[in-house]
UniProtKB/Swiss-Prot annotation:
Keywords: Cell inner membrane, Cell membrane, Membrane, Transmembrane, Transmembrane helix. One of its GO terms (cellular component) is plasma membrane. Residues 1-7, 67-68, 140-154, 218-221 are periplasmic. It comes from the Bacteria. This is UPF0056 inner membrane protein MarC. The chain crosses the membrane at residues 8-28, 46-66, 69-89, 119-139, 155-175, 197-217. Residues 29-45, 90-118, 176-196 are cytoplasmic. It is found in: Cell inner membrane. NCBIfam families: NAAT family transporter, PRK10995.1. Belongs to the UPF0056 (MarC) family. It comes from Salmonella typhimurium (strain LT2 / SGSC1412 / ATCC 700720). InterPro entries: Multi_antbiot-R_MarC. The keyword Plastid does not apply.
Length: 221
């Protein structure tokens, strides 16, 4: 049972900086300004469902994609590390706010014409929460844990859905409490937390690259 708790804790530590629900909160507040309370709650719930579904598909279909295209684990680690480090760097030194992204601008224009337009999948679920970095991390981590032997097989079966469900529930809670969160920490607080998470992502991405290079050296030495 301790192995299960350890796996869940490790998964949340790895995924939450990438998912970064607080950034999604800021985006949600910018896009849902004209929605009533019931519609906001519905969008919050649907965004969480979409995030859970995207993560599950990435985890279970990732190995199939790797086998189909002949992608090695070291190659995936290096590519995933580059993506994660790049996303972290952009969070450390943002060139644009979350609500100024192309996806958010496109959805804002759609909302101007149709105030009840769906914002749950794009941009809240993807790319804001379960974006390329999150998907790359999930696929890479799936390959690592399956071949690493660090956790028992039953933990590897049970832990991922629980981790993804926990991330989805955290996102849902943040979106439902978006107004209170914004009043509590403010835009400056969200920006500071995002930069801290960005630094962690840069470190994680660099470590992924190092691990991939070391594995290549070990394989071909």
């Amino acid at each position: 049972m301790m192995d299960l708790f350890k796996a869940i804790g490790l998964g949340l530590v790895v995924l939450l900086p990438l998912a970064n629900p607080l950034t999604t909160v800021a985006l949600f507040l910018g896009l849902a300004g004209n929605m009533n309370s019931a519609e906001r709650n519905r969008q919050s719930y649907m965004a969480s469902v979409y995030v859970f579904a995207i993560m599950m598909v990435a985890y279970y279909a990732g190995q199939l994609v790797m086998n189909t295209f002949g992608i090695s684990i070291p190659g995936l680690r290096i590519a995933g590390g580059l993506i994660v480090a790049f996303i972290g760097f952009r969070m450390l030194f943002p060139q644009q706010k979350a609500h100024e992204s192309p996806e958010a601008k496109s959805k804002s224009e759609e909302l101007a014409d149709e105030p009840t337009a769906n914002i749950a999948f794009v941009p809240l679920a993807m790319p804001s929460t379960a974006g390329p970095g999150t998907i790359a991390m999930i696929i890479s981590s799936a390959s690592t844990v399956r071949h690493g032997g660090e956790f028992p097989d039953w933990v590897i079966m049970v832990a991922p859905p629980i981790i993804f469900l926990a991330v989805a529930v955290i996102l849902w809670g943040c979106l439902r409490s978006s107004g209170a969160i914004m009043r509590l920490v403010g835009k400056g607080g969200i920006e500071a937390i995002s930069r801290l998470m960005g630094f962690l992502l840069v470190c994680m991405g660099v470590q992924f690259i190092i691990n991939g290079v070391l594995e290549i050296i070990k394989t071909y030495h």
